[in-house]
Amino acid sequence: MALAIDDEIVTNDLAFDDEARIYVLTGPNRGGKSVITVALGAAQALTQLGLPVTATEAVISPVSAIFTHFPEGADDTIDKGRLGEECARLNDIFLKVTNRSLVLLDESLSSTGSFEASYIAAEVLGGLAHFGCRCLFSTHLHE
């Protein structure tokens, strides 16, 4: 059975190299940012397992680890609050990340105001740049 799609399919290209190791993907809520973030992680994992990916073309070099920071439920926020929980999970990533890692951040720091989130996000991205890892940070923040 063929799938009928009325809307035009939008393709995406990402190239991690010495010129660009960190991407910040912005846009409105429900604009597809999370889909791209998950698709990148899936393509990386599938390729490293020797499995095919859904792409016209894919050249993917191996990573030593894939770290994810996606919104979680409220279970761990009682003691620390949601921002504290997010920062604790970011700290866990920083303790393990290397220049051969892929870090996927999806709507990280959305538990606080845009000024504070932008400040913390800039520090996080600066730290990840220091490690030299590959990173995709999808956010609704525009600052």
Residue ranges of predicted features:
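ATPase nucleotide-binding head domains, primarily ABC-like/P-loop NTPase cores
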Residues: M1-E143
